[in-house]
């Protein structure tokens, strides 16, 4: 039997991958995922209704915390994910949508899916 060569991954997970959409208008917005910075930490705190201690996650040397933002609007964090890269898998410690992207009044849909797809 002839061995097939690995072609890589080239598929769409869902209609929202690499974008999120406004639940009111239905408009879709392209997204970026980048590393969380120390200056970002002042905004992702429990006082601002974030559920998890992202400062703690950020300080863990074996973990990387990534933020999801809308292209051309990097100052507003839509969601966060904490990842640890192992030799045989990726461990997701935490995933959280921004407070304004939760529940019945959320602004954007697709945030967790984008973060998990990135992982």
Predicted regions and their residues:
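Non-catalytic substrate-recognition and accessory regions of acyl/acetyltransferase enzymes
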Residues: 1-110, 114
């Amino acid at each position: 039997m002839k061995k097939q060569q690995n072609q890589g991954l080239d598929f769409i997970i869902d209609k929202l991958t690499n974008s999120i959409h406004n639940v009111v208008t239905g408009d879709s917005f392209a997204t970026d995922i980048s590393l969380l910075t120390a200056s970002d930490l002042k905004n992702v705190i429990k006082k601002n209704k974030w559920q998890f201690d992202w400062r703690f996650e950020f300080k863990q040397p074996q973990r990387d915390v990534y933020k999801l933002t809308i292209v051309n609007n990097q100052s507003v964090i839509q969601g966060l994910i904490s990842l640890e890269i192992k030799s045989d898998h990726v461990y997701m410690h935490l995933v959280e949508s921004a407070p304004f992207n939760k529940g019945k009044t959320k602004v954007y849909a697709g945030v967790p899916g984008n973060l998990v797809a990135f992982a």
